[in-house]
Amino acid sequence: MKRFWKVCGLLLGAAALAVLLYHVTPVRILTEHEREQVASIEVACWGVEERSTITDPEEIDRILAPFLENRFRRGKPLGGDLAMQILLYNERGKCLAVLQETAAGGTLQLKRGIRFYHPVREDPAFEELYRSFRERMEAGS
């Protein structure tokens, strides 16, 4: 009977460790295959009525580069207000994914579908990305 409880304890410990590793291990939000399908990006910033559509492949690569790296953790750190949406479209105009960036008490949070992600560490690249899009859309271009 002692052996049974030892095995149960080991299985429970392994399950707890698996859940912990699932949330701590850095992941990417987009795969290379998904990136290859993206033909255009539409960006919308909260509080700005204009939407920006980008079709230049080099600019799309620059914008999506951070999302292709293992620099995010799963989970929702805090609540927050929607700051920006990045909609990814294929050549036929079908929406492939919606990435929502939320400013959560100074912490960046991203949502794709029903999954939440946040950067492994502070990343000024996302703040700069948001700022540049907001300035571009407020200028009307």
Model-derived segments and their meaning:
Residues K2-S141:
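Function-determining sites in protein domains
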